[in-house]
């Protein structure tokens, strides 16, 4: 008989009366009145093994096994006795009567029980091998595998070709810092790990491969958050001779296919499309969570002449904004709740949080409860009540500051209230999946510190055709042929139509204050390629880690990556990064300089 004939979790009634050989790990060992029960686990699940004392040698071995011992058992599949069926297990109607038990490898006492749900992330990542044995982690990584498989199936059916691009490449400015790799044979020179395959996939379009994809690692040396890793995985795609709408349709279908085939979720037949300007005006975010049934109300124009300088000053500022967030039934929020929200918005730069409770709307000013009402004239109060559509029992929160602070703080408050217990109880958040496309992004953002424009996405995104003239006269007015796919408040994919003409690409570089010499030095290979009849092309990249995190309902991207880094970009399992030998540094012509100590 083979070492293993079946997976533990797949032993069911169809094997009744058969002898099987199973391999796995001891989940738990129980001694019940002279009979030993072993819950044997492998990647497919659990099966109950019964060790009877009639087989003395086998029973003696069973007495010695402990949690996480790796064992092989041979035995007879039989029905469980009446009253002992476990409906929670696929194998819960049967058990295996053990005839032979072999310890393949003993285990030291594990540092934690695999069914402990209260482990710190540090403990889990330090002992990642054991953590990966947990059923939830097994589920997450197998889900990740299925998502990748279904993406490949779809793209293959659509005529895409999987082509690998280099991991050692040229350092080019794309927003985040590069991970640099020193070259031993080219002293003093460095490769960079790719932040994306962006330029190579464009070159593949010029090279007539028409449709390209790869599921690939990308690297960015940036500050980490719950949804970021220094190395992450993209489903990276590019296609020729398709317009923006056709590209969106193609990849919208891909995401629908993946969700249906992996978790049996039917996404909307057509994803709504929202311009960037509308998303910012209504939600303060370019990745709005449409499950939350709360929206901003614009009040900037109505607050220009009020005596309340907290409102009037930003209302009259060039980059200022005053906006409101009406919360239905929010009048029941306590002062403690409001104080908590006030402290919360300070995280996002807000100086405070003004509010008005609407007790009796019909009474106008007299029906409102708020410390700020006395500072507002009747016309402004009327505008607030009319524009927000406030009703008795509502509360209205206000943000007034630079537009970015208003958008960030009030947008975060919108999500916090919507997803709170109060929000759930009052229907302020819907269940399910709410996808959309956000389009028409600004082409450039102005960097006050450097006094120049920077690319909002990357410098290879095409401006909208009608905005080409602004590249040289007013770059701030340019909108891009860029699009992000957003799902439940997460950007899961982003892409654009690319620049395919050399003269347009050069104009964009000039708008970014990248001179001809610098452009040739950094991007000469691209500019040269664009001169050889480059086709119109565009593409998109999806964050595989993010998609799987959402599907799995995981708290963090780290829960869907086998060996992730911490928020300090450290691998607690292998203790990377770590110092290297002085000889290695000499071979690379590198001398370390100690970081400067902060002054006392």
UniProtKB/Swiss-Prot annotation:
<keyword id="KW-0963">Cytoplasm</keyword>
<keyword id="KW-0547">Nucleotide-binding</keyword>
<dbReference type="GO" id="GO:0006422">
    <property type="term" value="P:aspartyl-tRNA aminoacylation"/>
</dbReference>
<feature type="binding site">
    <location>
        <position position="220"/>
    </location>
    <ligand>
        <name>L-aspartate</name>
    </ligand>
</feature>
<dbReference type="InterPro" id="IPR006195">
    <property type="entry name" value="aa-tRNA-synth_II"/>
</dbReference>
<comment type="subunit">
    <text>Homodimer.</text>
</comment>
<protein>
    <recommendedName>
        <fullName>Aspartate--tRNA(Asp/Asn) ligase</fullName>
        <ecNumber>6.1.1.23</ecNumber>
    </recommendedName>
</protein>
<dbReference type="Pfam" id="PF02938">
    <property type="entry name" value="GAD"/>
</dbReference>
<feature type="region of interest" description="Aspartate">
    <location>
        <begin position="198"/>
        <end position="201"/>
    </location>
</feature>
<dbReference type="InterPro" id="IPR002312">
    <property type="entry name" value="Asp/Asn-tRNA-synth_IIb"/>
</dbReference>
<feature type="binding site">
    <location>
        <position position="229"/>
    </location>
    <ligand>
        <name>ATP</name>
    </ligand>
</feature>
<dbReference type="InterPro" id="IPR047090">
    <property type="entry name" value="AspRS_core"/>
</dbReference>
<dbReference type="InterPro" id="IPR012340">
    <property type="entry name" value="NA-bd_OB-fold"/>
</dbReference>
<keyword id="KW-0436">Ligase</keyword>
<feature type="binding site">
    <location>
        <position position="491"/>
    </location>
    <ligand>
        <name>ATP</name>
    </ligand>
</feature>
<feature type="binding site">
    <location>
        <position position="498"/>
    </location>
    <ligand>
        <name>L-aspartate</name>
    </ligand>
</feature>
<dbReference type="InterPro" id="IPR004365">
    <property type="entry name" value="NA-bd_OB_tRNA"/>
</dbReference>
<feature type="binding site">
    <location>
        <begin position="543"/>
        <end position="546"/>
    </location>
    <ligand>
        <name>ATP</name>
    </ligand>
</feature>
<dbReference type="InterPro" id="IPR004364">
    <property type="entry name" value="Aa-tRNA-synt_II"/>
</dbReference>
<dbReference type="Pfam" id="PF01336">
    <property type="entry name" value="tRNA_anti-codon"/>
</dbReference>
<comment type="function">
    <text>Aspartyl-tRNA synthetase with relaxed tRNA specificity since it is able to aspartylate not only its cognate tRNA(Asp) but also tRNA(Asn). Reaction proceeds in two steps: L-aspartate is first activated by ATP to form Asp-AMP and then transferred to the acceptor end of tRNA(Asp/Asn).</text>
</comment>
<dbReference type="GO" id="GO:0050560">
    <property type="term" value="F:aspartate-tRNA(Asn) ligase activity"/>
</dbReference>
<feature type="site" description="Important for tRNA non-discrimination">
    <location>
        <position position="83"/>
    </location>
</feature>
<dbReference type="Pfam" id="PF00152">
    <property type="entry name" value="tRNA-synt_2"/>
</dbReference>
<dbReference type="GO" id="GO:0005737">
    <property type="term" value="C:cytoplasm"/>
</dbReference>
<feature type="binding site">
    <location>
        <position position="174"/>
    </location>
    <ligand>
        <name>L-aspartate</name>
    </ligand>
</feature>
<dbReference type="GO" id="GO:0003676">
    <property type="term" value="F:nucleic acid binding"/>
</dbReference>
<keyword id="KW-0648">Protein biosynthesis</keyword>
<keyword id="KW-0067">ATP-binding</keyword>
<dbReference type="InterPro" id="IPR047089">
    <property type="entry name" value="Asp-tRNA-ligase_1_N"/>
</dbReference>
<dbReference type="InterPro" id="IPR004524">
    <property type="entry name" value="Asp-tRNA-ligase_1"/>
</dbReference>
<comment type="similarity">
    <text>Belongs to the class-II aminoacyl-tRNA synthetase family. Type 1 subfamily.</text>
</comment>
<dbReference type="GO" id="GO:0004815">
    <property type="term" value="F:aspartate-tRNA ligase activity"/>
</dbReference>
<dbReference type="GO" id="GO:0005524">
    <property type="term" value="F:ATP binding"/>
</dbReference>
<dbReference type="InterPro" id="IPR004115">
    <property type="entry name" value="GAD-like_sf"/>
</dbReference>
<feature type="binding site">
    <location>
        <begin position="220"/>
        <end position="222"/>
    </location>
    <ligand>
        <name>ATP</name>
    </ligand>
</feature>
<feature type="site" description="Important for tRNA non-discrimination">
    <location>
        <position position="32"/>
    </location>
</feature>
<dbReference type="InterPro" id="IPR045864">
    <property type="entry name" value="aa-tRNA-synth_II/BPL/LPL"/>
</dbReference>
<dbReference type="InterPro" id="IPR029351">
    <property type="entry name" value="GAD_dom"/>
</dbReference>
<feature type="binding site">
    <location>
        <position position="457"/>
    </location>
    <ligand>
        <name>L-aspartate</name>
    </ligand>
</feature>
<keyword id="KW-0030">Aminoacyl-tRNA synthetase</keyword>
């Amino acid at each position: 008989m083979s070492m293993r004939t079946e997976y533990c979790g797949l032993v069911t009634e169809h094997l009744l009366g058969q002898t099987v050989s199973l391999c796995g790990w001891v989940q738990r060992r129980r001694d019940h009145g002279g009979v030993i029960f072993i819950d044997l686990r492998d990647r497919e699940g659990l099966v109950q093994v019964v060790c009877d004392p009639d087989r003395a040698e086998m029973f003696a071995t069973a007495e010695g096994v402990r949690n996480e011992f790796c064992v092989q058992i041979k035995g007879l599949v039989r029905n469980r006795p009446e009253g002992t069926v476990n409906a929670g297990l696929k194998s819960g109607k049967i058990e295996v009567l053990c005839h032979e038990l072999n310890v393949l490898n003993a285990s030291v006492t594990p540092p934690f029980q695999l069914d402990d749900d209260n482990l710190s992330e540090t403990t889990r990542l330090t002992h990642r091998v054991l953590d990966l044995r947990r059923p939830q982690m097994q589920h997450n990584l197998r889900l990740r595998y299925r998502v990748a498989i279904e993406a490949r199936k779809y793209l293959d059916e659509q005529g895409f070709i999987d082509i690998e691009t280099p991991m050692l490449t040229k350092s080019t400015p794309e927003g985040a810092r590069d991970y640099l790799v020193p070259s031993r044979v080219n002293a003093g020179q460095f490769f960079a790990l790719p932040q994306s395959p962006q330029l190579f996939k464009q070159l593949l379009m010029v090279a007539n491969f028409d449709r390209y994809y790869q599921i690939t690692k990308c690297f960015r040396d940036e500050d980490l958050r719950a949804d970021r890793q220094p190395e992450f995985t993209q489903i990276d795609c590019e296609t020729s001779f398709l317009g923006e709408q056709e590209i969106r349709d193609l990849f919208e279908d891909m995401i629908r296919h993946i969700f249906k085939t992996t978790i049996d979720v039917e996404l909307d037949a057509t994803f709504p499309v929202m311009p960037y300007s509308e998303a910012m005006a209504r939600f303060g975010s370019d990745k709005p969570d449409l499950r939350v049934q709360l929206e901003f109300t614009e009040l900037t124009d109505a607050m220009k002449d009020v005596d309340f300088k907290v409102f009037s000053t930003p209302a009259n500022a060039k980059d200022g904004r005053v906006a409101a967030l009406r919360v239905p039934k929010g009048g029941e929020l306590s002062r403690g709740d409001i104080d908590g929200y006030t402290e919360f918005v300070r995280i996002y730069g807000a100086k405070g949080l003004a509010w008005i409770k609407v007790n009796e709307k019909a009474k106008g000013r007299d029906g409102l409860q708020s410390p700020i009402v006395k500072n507002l004239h009747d016309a402004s109060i009327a505008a607030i009540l009319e524009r927000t559509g406030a009703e008795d029992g509502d509360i209205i929160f206000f943000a007034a500051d630079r537009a970015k602070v208003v958008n960030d703080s009030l947008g975060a408050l919108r999500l916090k209230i919507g997803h709170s217990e109060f929000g759930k109880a009052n229907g302020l958040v819907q269940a399910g999946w709410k996808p959309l496309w956000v389009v028409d992004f600004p082409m450039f953002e102005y960097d006050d510190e450097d006094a120049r424009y920077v690319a909002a996405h990357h410098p290879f995104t095409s401006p909208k055709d009608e905005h080409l003239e602004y590249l040289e006269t007013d770059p701030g007015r340019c909108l891009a042929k860029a699009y992000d796919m957003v799902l439940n408040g997460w950007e899961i994919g982003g892409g654009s139509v690319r620049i395919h003409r050399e003269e347009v690409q050069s104009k964009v570089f000039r708008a970014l204050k990248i001179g001809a010499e610098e452009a040739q030095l950094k991007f000469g290979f691209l500019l040269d390629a664009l001169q050889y009849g480059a086709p119109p092309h565009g593409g998109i990249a999806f964050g595989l880690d993010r998609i799987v995190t959402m599907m799995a309902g995981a708290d963090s991207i780290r829960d869907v990556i086998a060996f992730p880094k911490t928020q300090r970009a450290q691998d607690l399992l292998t203790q990377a990064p770590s110092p290297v030998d002085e000889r290695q540094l000499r071979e690379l012509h590198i001398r370390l300089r100690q970081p400067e100590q902060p002054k006392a």
